[in-house]
């Protein structure tokens, strides 16, 4: 597994690892390993000299049980919105900014909308960037949507055709 590489990268980026949470899925993720994974580790931490605030009670568990989405044609590793909403609510205040530099299918953006947070996300792959915009627009059809692409701000209509 890549667990040690992720921990090393987390530390090399200057973050303090406070712990590891575990997303327990309702089904296996088939692979080439003898034991098939039914969980994903989630590193939890913050910058050592940064402010660390907690917005929940002291009864939150490191074991997160959320159903894995069925296979998605939009994105191969789509995360369930409730999975992301859970730590977002615990780790940020309403109207706080949440950054996701790997936008994927837009689950973080959707979780932020549902929890009254502001999401700043990016996705390098144009296909997945389009998935994010279309997923958002399907859920919030009246919301104004603008996309920043190559330094230019574009309307939803310009990128959806």
Residue spans for each PLM region:
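Core catalytic lobe of class I
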Residues: 1-129
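S-adenosyl-L-methionine
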Residues: 133-161
């Amino acid at each position: 597994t890549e667990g040690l590489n992720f921990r090393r990268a987390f530390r090399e980026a200057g973050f303090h690892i406070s712990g590891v949470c575990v997303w327990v899925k309702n089904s296996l993720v088939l692979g080439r390993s003898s034991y098939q994974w039914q969980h994903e580790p989630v590193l939890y931490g913050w910058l050592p000299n940064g402010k660390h605030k907690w917005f929940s009670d002291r009864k939150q568990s490191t074991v997160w049980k959320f159903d894995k989405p069925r296979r998605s044609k939009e994105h191969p590793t789509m995360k369930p919105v409730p999975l992301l909403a859970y730590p977002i609510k615990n780790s940020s205040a309403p109207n706080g900014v949440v950054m996701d530099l790997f936008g994927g299918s837009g689950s973080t953006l959707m979780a932020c909308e549902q929890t009254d947070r502001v999401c700043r996300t990016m996705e390098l792959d144009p296909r997945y960037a389009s998935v994010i915009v279309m997923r958002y627009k399907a859920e919030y059809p009246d919301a104004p949507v603008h996309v920043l692409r190559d330094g230019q701000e574009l309307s939803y209509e310009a990128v959806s055709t």
